[in-house]
Design a protein with these regions (language model features):
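Interdomain "pre-motor" coupling segment immediately N-terminal to P-loop NTPase/helicase cores
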Residues: 16-67
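Solvent-exposed alpha-helical segments within well-ordered globular domains of core cellular machineries
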Residues: 8, 20-23, 38-42, 58, ...
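Conserved P-loop
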Residues: 82-160, 207
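Walker B motif beta-strand of ABC-family P-loop ATPases
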Residues: 163
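Dynamic helix-loop-helix/coil hinge segments at AAA+ ATPase domain boundaries and subdomain interfaces
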Residues: 9-12, 17, 61-82
Length: 248
């Protein structure tokens, strides 16, 4: 049987995994020892693996994570009081299934962004979609989106993603426009999707960051009350690495 037409049709159908696997089988001298069902099973398995790999790459590309991080590489030896049991519990992504939130709080340099990106990367590996933003940049971009007509489209994209990562919460107090934008984002996601926030500011001071008592209650009610909290302390890891490099 001529295989070239089969290879061409697999290419047209975009069955790239099956195509590669069939080409590999054609080079195996003992492949005829396998039954038709066994060979077909190998082809289908390769196609499924190939498609999942491509979907994962797409999810990671769209997530735009700031750091290449994964939960397996998290350093629990650094003295920053990272609750390993809680973090590994979050790494199983059950909180995403339950539409809960996560807050990572701690001083600068203790690895908040890395931990957030590691959890987001794990979510992508588990089949969830994710989006990473530095909150100050997101709020600035939303202001621009209102001016050029993209606001509704951007907000829709944010509302639909399974995990929204908002990094650097509370670097500055929110102005009126930003308070309303943030409330709209959290209202659209409350009870439906999960949000992960990192901040140098302790949660007890977040009312001051929002800078409006009524809207602060509304925003924090949708964000904090169903959230897991990772509270970190300790010396900056960036500073520590810098000191080590200077002594090398």
């Amino acid at each position: 049987m001529l295989t070239q037409p089969i290879l061409e049709n697999l290419q047209k159908l975009r069955f790239y995994g099956m195509l590669t696997a069939l080409e590999e089988q054609m080079q195996m001298p003992d492949i005829d020892k396998l039954s038709f069902e066994e060979r077909m099973g190998l082809l289908v398995d390769r196609e499924m693996t190939d498609r999942e790999d491509r979907r994962l790459k797409t999810r990671l590309r769209k997530a735009k994570l700031r750091q290449q991080a994964c939960v397996e590489d998290v350093d629990f030896r650094h003295p920053r009081k990272l609750d390993k049991r809680l973090f590994m519990s979050l790494a199983d992504c059950r909180w995403l299934k339950e539409h809960n939130n996560t807050l990572i709080i701690g001083p600068t340099g203790v690895g908040k962004t890395y931990l957030a990106c590691a959890l987001a990367q794990k979510a992508c590996r588990e089949g969830y979609t994710a989006l990473y933003f530095r909150l100050p940049r997101l709020l600035h971009d939303l202001s621009i989106a209102k001016a050029d007509g993209r606001y509704d489209k951007v907000m829709m994209s944010i509302s639909r993603t399974d995990l929204l990562v908002l990094d650097d919460w509370g670097l500055d107090k929110f102005i009126k426009e930003h308070r309303h934008d943030l409330l709209e984002i959290l209202e659209d996601r409350h009870g439906l999707r999960s949000t992960l926030v990192t901040s140098q500011v302790p949660v007890k001071h977040w009312h001051e960051v929002v800078d409006d008592p009524t809207l602060a209650d509304a925003i924090l009610d949708r964000l904090v009350h169903n959230a897991y909290k990772l509270v970190l302390n300790g010396e900056s890891m960036r500073k520590k690495r810098s000191n080590v490099q200077r002594h090398i």
